[in-house]
Swiss-Prot record:
One of its GO terms (biological process) is mitotic sister chromatid segregation. Belongs to the CENP-Q/OKP1 family. The keyword Chloroplast does not apply. GO terms for cellular component: condensed chromosome, centromeric region; cytoplasm; inner kinetochore; kinetochore; microtubule; Mis6-Sim4 complex; nucleus; spindle pole body. It is found in: Nucleus; Chromosome, Centromere, Kinetochore; Cytoplasm, Cytoskeleton, Microtubule organizing center, Spindle pole body. InterPro entries: CAD_CENP-Q (IPR025212). Component of the kinetochore, a multiprotein complex that assembles on centromeric DNA and attaches chromosomes to spindle microtubules, mediating chromosome segregation and sister chromatid segregation during meiosis and mitosis. Component of the inner kinetochore COMA complex, which connects centromere-associated proteins and the outer kinetochore. COMA interacts with other inner kinetochore proteins to form the inner kinetochore constitutive centromere-associated network (CCAN), which serves as a structural platform for outer kinetochore assembly. Keywords: Cell cycle, Cell division, Centromere, Chromosome, Chromosome partition, Cytoplasm, Cytoskeleton, Kinetochore, Microtubule, Mitosis, Nucleus. It comes from Schizosaccharomyces pombe (strain 972 / ATCC 24843). This is Inner kinetochore subunit fta7. Component of the heterotetrameric kinetochore subcomplex COMA, which consists of fta2, fta7, mal2 and mis17. The COMA subcomplex is part of a larger constitutive centromere-associated network (CCAN) (also known as central kinetochore Sim4 complex in fission yeast), which is composed of at least cnl2, cnp3, cnp20, fta1, fta2, fta3, fta4, fta6, fta7, mal2, mhf1, mhf2, mis6, mis15, mis17, sim4 and wip1.
Amino acid sequence: MEMKRRVRAVRRDQIQKRWRPLEDKQRQEIIIIFRTCSRLVLNTIKSETRKSLAEEWFMNILLKIEAPLRNLPVPRKRKESILFSQLLSSNMQLEQQLYSDLDHINVLQQELKVETARLENEQKSYEEMKQNMAINNSRLADLKSKLHPYLKKGLKISHDNFSDSNDFSFQKKLNTEDSNTSKTSTLDMYKEKLKPFTKTMQIHANKTVQLSQTIQKATLLLQRLNNTKNIGLNKSSKLKIKNI
């Protein structure tokens, strides 16, 4: 929610007579609000060096702000403002919950990276197995095409040795069945080897989907927490502006 700017003309003699500087407690509350709001920005900095430099720069700015606040005249209160201690405690609770959610998101992101790396390795292994299977199939087909003439030649010789033509047809059928059986057994062997990789890839894919859904839920929760904190701060700012 965007705050609207309000301008009010006040005479100088009225400021000198009725307005008074801020109390020490009020100045401390203003500094605490600045520090609380600054944490949300500083925590987004990933580099520890840049974060420490930003904190040092912000503390210097606060020191420069605190000196003029001591002599800044403000009007007297007309109504009771909201209790700052309650607002501060609720903000601290939301901030702690936000930190725990951020830690949980970091853990989920690390697990997601690990599962993604495992899934990539499984996919590579699966592709290698498929390539090996294709190479072996091509070798089997090549051997089959090369062996058939020799087998036929051998069968012709055996036909000359044996008078019965049924023996020759039986031998040809037997050789063909042996070739088909060896090819089928090889295919079954590689299919059995590929089954564990396929199951593992499916498990990792399901885990990846679950982690992605959990991260989305945590992100929505963080957005709600930030919106709640911003609404609390906006309400306190509006009440202070009304008092002014």
